[in-house]
Amino acid sequence: MFKAETHPDYPPEEGCYIRGNDRSPVAVLIILKWDQDKVPPEIERLVRAGAESGAALSGTLQTENIGLEKVICNVVSNPNIRYLVMGGPESPGHLIGEVIRALFENGIDEKQRIIGTESPHPFLFNISREMIERFRDQLTLVDLQFQQDPDIVRKAVWSCYQEEPVEFNGQELYDPGAWPEAPLSGTITWKILQPYWEPEDEKQAEAKRKALDLMERIKQRNAERSLEGPDKAGG
């Protein structure tokens, strides 16, 4: 079974996850709809089940944009990860489960928006298209959303480890070995910190450009007044 070296910076992004076996073929992602300081015990049990069963990474995800970008950065820096086991509830505001399914099925459009989801802000602005496509190609989604039994997560992880295919939840799972290409490195660029403020069409984009232009003119005018000194500025 071919296993690859991870990128030296693996995992490049910090987050709410447990790092396990770097040669594991599976990562576990549990959707979190609560604040980090209010994580219920049943969610913690699912995360621990993933880690204790041998997942490379096992943790939670709260947002469909920056949070998901961090997940993608971490996964593509380890070619050994070939499955993403997704569990937990749906997040009413973010629709994270729907977003992840849509990403695997449809990818992104020219604006870096995930296609085919009703989530309000499913934009991946801060990572490259190459990383997004590697994530989609390298991984197979094992969808356990709404399952609350840690034993099901354990069985999913176990199934991903097998040398011969086994049936699990309607899928054939086994360890196919590492993705044959070199790991991708990189962290999110933080170019866009608040995706929900980004324009979604040309009309909104034009309004944003005008607002930024006005702000820049006001900034320059204030700078000129400060250089003139109190006498001229005050008339």
Predicted regions and their residues:
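Divalent-metal-activated hydrolytic enzyme cores
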Residues: G107-K191
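Conserved mixed alpha/beta catalytic, RNA-binding, or beta-rich assembly cores of soluble enzyme
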Residues: K3-I115, Q194-W197, A205-G235
